[in-house]
C-alpha cells in the first residue's frame, strides 16, 4: 500500500507539456529567452511583469498575478507565479543548518523536480540582478506566506 501511495504521489507531480495551460507555457518560453539576462531594472518583480506581459496574461498590479493556488493542497505547475512574504526557510544537512529570510520577493515556478522540490526562476537574488534558476525545497518553509498564482489568459 505504501508503495502504491508513493508511486501515485510521484506520478501526480510529473507534468507533461500537454497539461501546461498555454499562458503558463508562454511564461516558461519567456523565462528560457531571458535566462542569464537582466530584465528591466533587475528587480524580482520585473521578471514576473515581463513574463505576464509576454504571455498576454490578465492580472492586476501589484500582486494580482492570477488565480490563487494553495500549493499544499492543489497541483502547482511550471509558469505559476510565486509571491513570497516574510518567509523563513531552513535546510539541514549532516553538519549544518542554513536559514534564510525573504521579506518580499517574487519568483516563477520553472520546473517540478519531485514532491516539494522545485526549480524557480528569479532575479535580484544575493545582489545578482540577472535571471537565474534555483532549487527550492518547499518543505524548508518554516514561517511566512508562500502564495502561488495561476496566470489567466487575457
Go through the PLM ranges and name each one.
Residues 1-7:
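Sec-dependent signal peptide recognition
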Residues 8, 12, 152-153:
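Prokaryotic Sec-type signal peptides and long signal-anchor helices
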Residues 22, 35, 100-154:
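Aromatic- and glycine-rich peptidoglycan recognition patches
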Residues 58-126:
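...with weaker cross-activation on analogous glycine-rich loops/strands in unrelated enzymes
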Residues 10, 14-61, 66-69, 89, ...:
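N-terminal capping segments
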Amino acid at each position: 500500500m505504501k508503495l502504491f501511495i508513493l508511486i501515485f504521489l510521484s506520478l501526480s507531480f510529473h507534468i507533461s507539456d500537454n497539461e501546461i495551460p498555454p499562458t503558463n507555457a508562454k511564461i516558461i518560453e519567456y523565462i528560457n529567452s531571458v535566462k542569464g539576462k537582466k530584465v528591466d531594472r533587475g528587480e524580482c518583480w520585473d521578471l514576473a511583469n515581463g513574463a505576464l506581459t509576454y504571455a498576454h496574461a490578465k492580472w492586476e498590479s501589484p500582486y494580482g498575478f492570477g488565480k490563487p493556488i494553495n500549493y499544499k493542497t492543489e497541483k502547482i505547475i511550471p509558469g505559476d507565479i510565486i509571491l513570497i512574504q516574510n518567509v523563513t526557510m531552513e535546510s539541514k544537512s549532516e553538519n549544518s543548518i542554513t536559514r534564510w529570510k525573504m521579506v518580499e520577493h517574487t519568483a516563477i515556478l520553472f520546473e517540478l523536480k519531485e514532491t516539494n522540490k522545485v526549480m524557480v526562476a528569479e532575479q535580484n537574488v544575493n545582489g545578482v540582478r540577472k535571471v537565474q534558476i534555483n532549487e527550492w525545497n518547499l518543505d524548508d518553509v518554516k514561517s511566512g506566506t508562500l502564495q502561488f498564482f495561476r496566470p489567466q489568459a487575457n
